[in-house]
Amino acid sequence: MLCRFAAGILAATISHTMAIETPDYKVAEQDGKFEVRDYPAMTVARTEMGDGDFMRLFRYISGGNEAEQKIAMTAPVLVQHKGEESGMSFVVPREVAAAKVPAPKGAEVSVDTMPAARFAVFTYSGRRTDKNEADALGRLRAWMDTKKLRAEGEPVFAYYDPPWTLPFMRRNEVMLRVAAEQQIVLP
């Protein structure tokens, strides 16, 4: 009985993850769980972190926008900490971004463009905790030092899985933008 339940959770998690659009990128270098990736410009819906942050974005993609248009959920959910301010973003699906992105109904959600850039990335599993984020960021910074890559800006944490995914099966990433003088973004 327990095995069937676990198998069901596993199957649901895998099928859910496989059906979600993720951003395009090109891998410039791979070293185990570390990569250097070139991302094209992306359109994101963003809100400030705080009570109800996820739900503000979820309402926006569920038709709570000026066009009352439903927008497919994508992965990952991006979290960026900037000193006292933190933000959460959803990447807008390519098809919607290529057409016309609906305007948010209020000031709580903004639609922004993340410019094309090269990022150093470390992939890890586990729960979303301050300790796990700090450990992952420390590992990425140490790896970047060995590669003589300099970071600029604040880290971006990427969470690909729904909260009911077993921690050891979660795909999480920490990303640091590679310094401008080291940017060689592929076409």
What are these regions (language model features)?
Residues 2-187:
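A solvent-exposed interaction/effector surface
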